Amino acid sequence: MSHAIDELQAIIAELKTELEEPKATGGVATNSRLARDRIDRMSAEVVDSNPYSRLMALQRMNIVKDYERIRDKAVAIVGVGGVGSVTADMLTRCGIGKLILFDYDKVELANMNRLFFTPDQAGLSKVEAAAATLSFINPDVEIETHNYNITTVENFDRFLDTISQGGRIAGQPVDLVLSCVDNFEARMAINAACNERNLNWFESGVSENAVSGHIQFIRPGDTACFACAPPLVVAENIDEKTLKREGVCAASLPTTMGITAGFLVQNALKYLLNFGEVSDYLGYNALSDFFPKMTLKPNPQCDDRNCIVRQKEFQARPKPVVIEEKAVSEEPLHATNEWGIELVAEDAPESNPTPTEAPVVGEGLRLAYEAPERSSETSEETVTTAPADETSLEDLMAQMKSM
């Protein structure tokens, strides 16, 4: 009897291990799916086994000069939710060198209307689940996760140090920060950190009704920071929690979040690889398919003191020299016309000189042929008409036969 109980307990323990294994790997069953081997260098070879062939084709089409430089870039993504998770997915598939993920939330079944996460990952932290999935998609990408709230005083300093020293080269800052958070407090924390360390970053968001979104490229001192023109909630110091009621949540569409994430990653790639035009602000209205673009200038009276410092530094930079093109003169290149050449408009009426006028030629030239002068008197042509003949037709016929 005791032996049978021991066998049952062993079977139960084995089943528990099998159930826990997918959770420990972020929902990826390692015994059924094996990740590919790492690739040391990107190749443009067009074969089915090359995951980078279609990306490297951008070089052949003269879109990007050196696509492999993306492996030298480090990007920090704050917020791994509806927009942030898709953003991380896209950058991973593009072969980014390093991703640093920040989030303190967990995956819930309520998140399944969005992209990326799967139901078997419910209960895991978002950064843990994302890291497991992203590593399986592209093991060449270095992924670093931070499971904490960046808005607290202690964690803000940790966040500041990470983005300042978390680049591909040890001790160097990240190349770009992407804000994919859903609250103003976190946006203000990212804004303060990037202003303090003078880091370029993208702010992004989707409206509560899920039918509009936007991205904004913020360059400290050059464009408006998030505190230069804050939303009403931030400007009035209203506690955002008071606006939320129990049983009420924001709407969410995977389409709007996917479009916003696509805009975000597209402009991030253009900035990192230096091709195309990076949009300072790009919006999206799903109801009318409207895409507004604009540039927001910094506020000289911004409440963020570091923003004021960056504005002064930007204004002190030497302005780029603009070479003005010389105006094309409409005066004739040569004042003298030695050969007597004249230009006549195509639509001008043709004017033939009268026979008595001699054509004008240059000095030292003479005409090879001169037309003879015509007499002013016109000859009259004499037209001789036969007199009327009264001979009949029969007589004429008889005369012709006798000839």
UniProtKB/Swiss-Prot annotation:
One GO-annotated biological process of the protein: neuromuscular process
A GO molecular-function annotation: UFM1 activating enzyme activity
Signal peptide: none
Keyword hit for Metal-binding: yes
Membrane spanning residue stretches: none
Recorded superkingdom: Eukaryota
InterPro entries: D-isomer_DH_CS1 (IPR029752), ThiF/MoeB/HesA (IPR045886), ThiF_NAD_FAD-bd (IPR000594), Ubiquitin-activating_enz (IPR035985)
Residues bound to ATP: G82, D103, K126, N149, N183
Record-annotated active site: C249 (glycyl thioester intermediate)
Any one cellular-component term (Gene Ontology): cytosol
Key words of the record: ATP-binding, Metal-binding, Nucleotide-binding, Ubl conjugation pathway, Zinc
CDD domains registered for this protein in UniProt: ThiF_MoeB_HesA_family
Pfam hit, one: ThiF
Ranges for region Disordered: 371-403
Residues binding Zn(2+): C225, C228, C302, C307
Role this protein plays: E1-like enzyme which activates UFM1.
Assigned protein family: Belongs to the ubiquitin-activating E1 family. UBA5 subfamily.
Protein name as annotated: Ubiquitin-like modifier-activating enzyme 5
Species of origin: Drosophila yakuba
